[in-house]
Amino acid sequence: MARRHWAAGLAVVLVGAVALVIPGAAHAAQPGSAGVGSKDALAQSSCDPETGRIRLQFYGAPPCVRAWEDDADNGGATAQGVTRDSIKAVVLVPPEDKDKSSTNGGIKNQATGANGLSKDAVLDENAVLAHSYQTWGRTIEYEFVEASGTDETAQRADAVTVTAKKPFVVLDTATFASGGGGQVFQQAVAAAGVPGNDPPMSASDLLKPLELNIAEWAGKELVGGKAKFGGDDVKNEQRVFGDIYPGGADGMDLDVFTKAFAKYGGKVAPGAAVSYSVPTDPQAQTAAFQEQASPLIAKLKNAGVTTVVNFAGAGLTANATGTFTKQATSQDWFPEWIVTGSPYNDLDFFARSFDQEQWSHAFGQVWFTPYVAGGASDALTALFQWYWGKSQGTHSPGVFSLVYRLYNGVMTAGPNLTGKTFDAALRKFPASGGAFQDMITNLETGIPPAPIPLRGTALAWWDPDATGGSNQIGIPGTGKYAYLNGGKRYLRGKYPDELQPFFDPAKSVLQFDAIPAQDLVGPYPCVDCPSTGGSQSPASAS
């Protein structure tokens, strides 16, 4: 995921859990390097030597780096947008009216409880990380540009505007509010040679780990059985599999799934692999999905499909899965729906918007963690409030994802900051720990260390009548994923061989009362932070 981020819907960034392994730990730091894991790094007061990470109240804290003297030579202007004292970041923001009306990106002003602005969120999330991260004598400085529109022409024009400012990195917050930016914009910025940007992750790359996970799990547990979790018209039939997936040049590579599925005796029925197109303009997506829904569902139904392996996405601006499930009900067809973890079908908040008659037959793999009573599952909010407290500052998980990536690259690249060292640092950035029952992924920590990255998932089914906070983000409502085996998570190669007890409430958990003790971080004090009496004021107060 070469310096990429998820550029779809609600960008909730989570970093997953495996033991921290820092190559060359406890070695001598090399001149010009960050000295990640060196003896010098582990000896710093900012470092917790037991974890090898800085004392940041977040399970995705970066690895410790070596000491830095304020008057040391960092190389000065090592790259475009970089000087001895600063790193230039240009941020594309949506028009203010769209920013305030959107819930994509989850922007919230803690002082008012209302939607906040992207600009304020960037500055306030920046303050959280600037407090604890090592940036080698440089300060990250932001310049904001308002997006001119959402269509391809506007995206290309905005890319020209921001790249002309010669930044080290460009952040796209406009896409969260469907107020501009997006795939075309991000690709154009990367093509212009901005050091800290590569093209956004394609649907093909994003979905490969999901395809392999689903192929193994469904191959082991579902192939050869009856569609017992479907509606009355299919539940006594042998399973017949069909696929829904995003097509086109930048779409999903279906062969990854079909070849892996075949290893377990699985196959997609003839004519039952149906693709749909996704316009680059988010404002055009809803109409496009509606136009494609009827023939798409009819094709699956006519092929005798009992079990839909659903790689379609879901979001607030455009909801492919919501559109397709509503069409299935209108055609009086109630198959099993396989939850693949395709963004963001496995988030309670979005799944509540699907046709509930259909989604009551949904089960499969969920990446997001169960809700924890009191909102403790939201590690990003907990980190934000560790610094700002609970009554000030503008917080956004989506904006945090962009700023977090920037700081991780800058800190672990070391003083010699270039596009290549930034890229290499993100490639080496370790997958991160905690997150309830061994949540594992390296999709969001930078570049995966292999062409197809790790992605651990829990097994769950949809309970349309359950109430409570959404998994991961806590938004209350009706409808929740029920997790099997206490929320245990599996990596590829480790999925159970036998069919698990889906749709059995007695063997499922909807949420945790508290974070498991083994997944707690710290606690670490936040010294001189607004939450502990520091004088920093949030951006919205200026």
Per-region residue spans from a language model:
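C-terminal region of N-terminal signal peptides and the immediate post-cleavage residues
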Residues: V18-V36
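N-terminal extracellular/periplasmic Venus flytrap/periplasmic-binding protein-like
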Residues: P31-T161
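Solvent-exposed, acidic/polar segments of extracytosolic/periplasmic ligand-binding ectodomains
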Residues: G35-G76, Q80, A431-S542
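Beta-alpha junction/loop-to-helix N-cap segments that form part of ligand/metal-binding clefts
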Residues: A43, D73-A77, L117-L123, H131-L212, ...
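Short, charged, surface-exposed loops that flank catalytic or proteolytic processing sites
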Residues: R138, G393, M411-A424
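Extracellular/periplasmic Venus flytrap/periplasmic-binding protein
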Residues: T150-T153, S202-Q331
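Periplasmic-binding protein-like
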Residues: V162-S178, V194-P200, V240-Y245, K301-F324, ...
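Extracellular/periplasmic periplasmic-binding protein-like sensory domains
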Residues: Q327-L402, T412-A413, P505, L510
